[in-house]
A protein has these predicted regions:
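Interface amphipathic segments
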Residues: 1-469
Length: 469
């Protein structure tokens, strides 16, 4: 080990059980590391010594840390990424306690901002983890740069925290915090309150946002441990303006409100979780207000059921609302649906898709339908530039390799064009020929001379594709 390149100056005095060092000046490789006063109290057992330090200047950065380890010939230790992103840490305040168990009262200034603390800090002897319990506040800290999140900016908050962190992430945190402001996607949110517990695989608590462009209250639990996942949430949303929050550029005057209840449960491996999903999502009184248009959906109910029938996975997904009634049911696995689509496409249009390596799934039988209504009210409220005053429908099935899809839209209107009687049908015959049919009647705008000469246009398309052809 090389000679340690450090200088130390202090006025020392004390007795058998204590040492006092006043006017300390500590430098490492010419850079000032510490100025202040330290009192060390130690009983017979040296491993339980107690330190009180009044820090007028305590400085730390990655270069200093790395140089110190090199001079001490210590290998295999690296700073956690969040600490590296801080660039440097300058602490002014008091430190009381044992080396691994310290009470802090002061302020940390870093390249990302200043954080005031008053609490107990416990540091892992390997420097790969830490725990803090106490009060933390800041008037401005660049949290996005701390965690390498480009959409996050500055944050100002006041919080009581009991949390742990390892080399890469938070592992546990109990917190009650008031976030006075935080930047996300270039918008500054105000008046956010958090109260809950966070673990690696669980969040349980409440979130409240009372901002000019969103009033949101979330209460509940999300638990995603190794074997089971459960989500139980109650969400109240009012005066939500997606455009004002920079979530979209469309419909700048749109305001949304709703009450949502979510209860979902699943289990198994990540590949099995979707096939084991059960529960519901209920949206009450979804209200859309956009300029002079208002639209309300009294209730949207999504019901998800999964079980095993005759040794096969059976699923039923039902969607019920003022807007749409839909159902998907049968024996299948969600993971197999892309493979089925690849097989069918390759069978009739082999130039488009390569033959899948996975065999066609057995025991696949599913039926589906969807009936829509009141779509014109929704499209008018959202300024989509299209009206659907009629009641579109779609239905079909997949039984083994037998495919059938039918869709009918009585009418679609744009500003100047109307299309009537849109009929779409796709089915295969005896598992050999795939037939596609499309019919529509188009009324062109009469204020256009060319369109007026053409009049109405009827279109009929019929296409057949044969197996391996």
């Amino acid at each position: 080990m090389d000679q340690l390149d450090a200088t130390f100056e202090a006025n020392l005095h004390g007795g058998l059980d204590s040492i006092f060092a006043d006017s300390i000046h500590l430098s490492f490789k010419g850079d000032k590391v510490f100025d202040g006063n330290v009192a060390i109290y130690y009983p017979i057992l040296l491993d339980s010594l107690y330190v009180h330090a009044n820090c007028k200047h305590l400085y730390f950065d990655e270069v200093l840390f790395r140089d110190l380890l090199n001079q001490l010939d210590i290998k295999g230790i690296a700073l956690p990424l969040p600490l590296t992103n801080l660039k440097h840490i300058h602490y002014v305040g008091d430190i009381d306690g044992r080396l691994e168990d310290m009470q802090l009262h002061g302020a940390f200034t870093t390249a990302l901002g200043t954080m005031r603390v008053n609490g107990l800090m416990q540091i892992d002897t390997t420097l790969q983890g830490a725990n803090f319990k106490g009060h933390v506040s800041t008037n401005g800290f660049q949290i996005g740069k701390l965690f390498n999140h480009k959409d996050l900016g500055n944050i100002a908050f006041d919080a009581h925290i009991d949390g742990s962190i390892d080399s890469t992430q938070f592992t546990h945190c109990i917190a009650e915090a008031t976030i006075k402001k935080v930047d996300y996607l270039g918008y500054t949110y105000h008046n956010i309150h958090l109260d809950g517990e966070w673990n690696i695989n669980e969040i349980n608590g409440t979130l409240s946002i009372q901002d000019d462009n969103i009033q949101l209250n979330i209460n509940g639990l999300a638990d995603w441990d190794q074997d089971d996942t459960r989500i139980d949430l109650e969400i109240q949303l009012n005066d939500f303006s997606p455009a004002a929050l920079h979530l979209t550029e469309k419909n700048p005057n749109l305001r949304i409100g709703a009450n949502t209840y979510i209860s979902l449960y699943t289990s198994g491996t990540p590949q099995e979780m979707l096939d084991n999903l059960n529960g519901y999502v209920i949206v009450d009184s979804l209200k859309l207000a956009n300029n002079d248009e208002n639209y309300t959906i009294e209730q949207i109910k999504l019901l998800i059921d999964s079980e095993i029938k005759d040794n096969c996975p059976y699923h039923q997904v039902r969607l019920q609302s003022d807007l749409v009634t839909a159902n998907l049911s049968g024996t299948f696995t969600y993971a197999a649906l892309p493979t089925i689509a690849q097989h069918i496409t390759h069978k009739y249009l082999p130039l488009l898709v390569e033959k899948p390596q996975v065999k066609y799934p057995k025991n696949t039988n599913l039926d589906f339908y969807a009936y829509f209504r009141q779509l014109d009210q929704l499209t008018n409220t959202l300024n989509l530039g299209i009206d659907i005053p009629s009641y579109p429908t779609i239905k079909g099935h997949l039984h083994g390799q037998d495919v059938q899809i039918q869709a009918f839209v009585p009418s679609i209107k744009t500003n100047k064009t109307q299309i009537n009687d849109i009929t779409f049908a796709l089915h295969n015959t005896n598992d050999e020929k795939l037939n596609l049919s499309l019919y529509m009647l188009t009324h062109l705008p009469q204020d256009n001379p060319t369109a007026a000469k053409l009049g109405d246009i009827k279109a009929r398309i019929h296409v057949s594709a044969y197996d391996d052809n």
